[in-house]
Regions:
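Glycine-rich phosphate/pyrophosphate-handling loop used in enzymes and phosphotransfer proteins
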Residues: 1-275
Length: 275
């Protein structure tokens, strides 16, 4: 599966051809300061269930504790094994939306901790043969699903933040005797969309078409194992297109890890008696 990668560095380093580390826009810092000021003046509410006087209640926090579960309904991911930490329903949905849309940046540390936990749990989902093949490659890339241009301009790189956290958890969980360097690298960019950049107001077919278009790969990945990371999976089409792009560039996609998985639409069908 691997092609004689160079010796592992003593600490993670960017791959050749990657741009410098992400720069956080000044607007993001200003927003954070304003939110901190508002938190002093306004009473806090749980981002999940709305309970007063707490930013995140213990019950909602426990929903991010795992364990990891396979996501069989992500048909769009093809044969890529997808695992999720929790279900994208109820309070979890409110948590993720609040965090990724910028209204609850105070959840960042909580989500990072959830990502680290997912990274620590993921090696347990692997068969021994697969784990051995990954270790022999000496490097494992943790690659986030690509963010759109608007989110990049705002500095809200949710999937990239999660990937960083997953990589930290993975590095701690992997057996110490295995000479494996775990690298989090944001090397995918979305392909130009058909029509306007924003997906709102578009038909479901057009949205699926845009998501399924393979992204661009910015760095050499031939012979390297890759774990894809995203915040939410619904149909799996985004993860599937990312895997196809990476595999076309010679990478070995070993799986995908998400914070939450939307339930299967088939599981939500309600049968009305007498109809």
């Amino acid at each position: 599966m691997c092609s004689n990668p160079p010796p592992s560095p003593s600490r993670p380093a960017p791959l050749p051809g990657l741009l410098p580390a992400r720069l956080r826009p000044l607007a993001s810092t200003t927003t954070s300061l304003l939110q901190e000021a508002a938190s002093v003046l306004l009473p806090a509410r749980c981002a999940g269930c709305g309970t007063w006087e707490t930013r995140l209640c213990l019950q909602c926090r426990s929903l991010l504790a795992g364990p990891l579960a396979p996501v069989p309904q992500a048909d769009g991911a093809g044969d890529l094994p997808v695992h999720a930490l929790t279900s994208y329903t109820g309070p979890v949905r409110a948590l993720v939306l609040g965090w990724k849309n910028g209204g609850r940046e105070d959840l960042t540390q909580t989500m990072r901790e959830a990502g680290e936990r997912a990274g620590q749990l993921w090696p347990r989902t692997l068969e021994a043969t697969t784990a051995g093949q990954i270790a022999r490659c000496s490097r494992l890339l943790v690659v986030p699903a690509p963010s759109g241009p608007t989110r990049r301009l705002r500095g809200r790189l949710v999937a990239a933040d999660l990937a960083d956290a997953v990589a930290r958890g993975l590095a701690r969980a992997w057996p110490e005797h295995a000479d494996l360097t775990v690298l989090s690298t944001d090397l995918l960019r979305r392909a130009p969309q058909i029509g306007a950049a924003h997906q709102s107001g578009r038909s479901a077919r057009r949205r699926r078409s845009n998501r399924a278009r393979p992204p661009r790969v910015l760095a050499p990945v031939a012979g390297l194992p890759v774990l894809l990371v995203d915040d939410v999976v619904t149909t799996g089409s985004t993860l599937g297109s990312c895997a196809r792009a990476l595999e076309s560039a010679g990478a070995w996609c070993v799986g995908a890890l998400v914070l939450a998985a939307a339930p299967s639409p088939r599981a939500q069908v309600t049968v009305v008696p007498g109809r």
